[in-house]
């Protein structure tokens, strides 16, 4: 049976064997607090590649030591990180998957011993540190850090880079008027609030020729915050700059109550795909092959980002294929045990 979920998808010169993407999820497992890959990461990401995920995306990887969410985040702020990342990429590709990395800076959400930085001196909540408002020199240093991280990503062999512009981290903090109260060229109007991301994209594109994604929070869930309609303009600017796909998440720039339900963020991917004419990824409580297939058939998104379901089941692609009646090729090492996985949902 032909399916959309298991059809190839080509972005520039990179072809994914299917539309399933492992959503970037922080593992907080760099145990020596040096940002380096551990055996856990190799097994964690390698298993999903063996499970036949089309694009395995590594977690938020810090472009600066002070830009980590925690001391145990993965890092890419110096050349010593390349070797471990390279090994992980190599293992992913051995299993015919493509490898992506999410480049990130935590901004005011960094929970380290150092003082966090942000566009403005506004804490996320009353339990977190008041961040230091970034100087223009710090802004330029951070843009350079993203560029250097892109160079290292290329050296490590990644196929795709994603910029983390969501969930209340630094890029998102500049975009949202709730966290950006600057009065210079990096604050105020939508165009000014976009400037930080614009300059990061420009810097990355100078050294990176491959596919470039941006993850966004398409809704601030606040009456004075951003909505998906605001992101239509941002997405158009990103497309003009050569961004290939918008990964559509939501929330977490300020504390807010969010009603979640299966596929609750798909509407954002659909809206931006239609109104900004850019490829999108859907994410958020997508837990079955039938659900994922329907999103693609309805042209609501181009790729399906799967998070927690891949934590529960590293072989989710096989489960999804069984649901859809699609014959997924076994890894040759496992060919002595052909056939469908039992359907335990009944």
Curated annotation (Swiss-Prot):
**Top enzyme category:** oxidoreductase
Query: Which example biological process does GO assign this protein?
Result: response to toxic substance
Annotated EC = 1.6.99.1
Keywords noted in UniProt: Detoxification, Flavoprotein, FMN, NADP, Oxidoreductase
Against InterPro entries, the record matches this protein to:
Aldolase_TIM, NADPH_DH_bac, OxRdtase_FMN_N, YqjM-like
> Which transformation does this protein catalyse, written as a reaction?
A + NADPH + H(+) = AH2 + NADP(+)
* One Gene Ontology molecular-function label: FMN binding
Keyword Membrane on entry: no
Annotated binding of FMN, by residue = 23-26, 60, 102, 215, 307-308
For the ligand (substrate), the binding residues are: 28, 164-167
Instruction: Name the cofactor(s) required for activity, per the record.
Output: FMN
**Cited function:** Catalyzes the reduction of the double bond of an array of alpha,beta-unsaturated aldehydes and ketones. It also reduces the nitro group of nitroester and nitroaromatic compounds. It could have a role in detoxification processes.
User: Quaternary arrangement and interactors, per the entry?
Assistant: Homotetramer.
Family membership, please give it. Belongs to the NADH:flavin oxidoreductase/NADH oxidase family. NamA subfamily.
**HAMAP family given in the database record:** NamA (MF_01614)
Q: What is this protein called?
A: NADPH dehydrogenase
**Coding gene?**
namA
């Amino acid at each position: 049976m032909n399916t959309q979920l298991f059809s190839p998808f080509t972005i520039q010169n990179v072809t994914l064997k299917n539309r399933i993407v492992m959503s970037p999820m922080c593992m907080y497992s760099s145990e020596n607090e040096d940002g380096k890959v551990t055996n856990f990461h190799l097994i964690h990401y390698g298993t999903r590649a063996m499970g036949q995920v089309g694009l395995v995306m590594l977690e938020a990887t810090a472009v600066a030591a002070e830009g980590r969410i925690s001391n145990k985040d993965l890092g890419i702020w110096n050349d010593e990180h390349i070797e471990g990342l390279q090994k992980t990429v190599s293992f992913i590709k051995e299993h015919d998957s493509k490898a992506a990395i999410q480049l990130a800076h935590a901004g005011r959400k960094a929970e380290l011993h150092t003082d966090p930085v942000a566009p403005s001196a506004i804490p996320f909540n009353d339990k977190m540190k008041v961040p230091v408002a970034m100087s223009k020199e710090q802004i330029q240093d951070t843009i350079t850090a993203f560029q250097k991280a892109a160079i290292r990503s290329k050296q490590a062999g990644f196929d795709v880079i994603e910029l983390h512009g969501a969930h209340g981290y630094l890029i998102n903090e500049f975009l949202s008027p709730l966290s950006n109260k600057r009065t210079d060229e990096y604050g105020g109007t939508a165009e000014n609030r976009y400037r930080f991301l614009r300059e990061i994209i420009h810097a990355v594109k100078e050294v990176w020729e491959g596919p470039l994604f941006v993850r966004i929070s398409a809704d601030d869930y606040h009456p004075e915050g951003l909505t998906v309609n605001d992101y239509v303009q941002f997405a158009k600017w990103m497309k003009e700059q050569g961004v290939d796909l918008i990964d559509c998440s939501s929330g977490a720039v300020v504390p807010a109550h969010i009603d979640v339900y299966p596929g609750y963020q798909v509407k954002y991917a659909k809206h931006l795909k239609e109104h900004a004419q850019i490829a999108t990824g859907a994410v958020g409580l997508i837990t079955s092959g039938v659900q994922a297939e329907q999103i693609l058939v309805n042209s609501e998104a181009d790729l399906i980002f799967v998070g927690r379901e891949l934590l529960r089941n590293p072989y989710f692609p096989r489960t999804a294929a069984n649901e859809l009646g699609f014959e997924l090729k076994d890894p040759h090492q496992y060919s002595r045990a052909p056939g469908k996985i039992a359907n335990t949902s009944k």
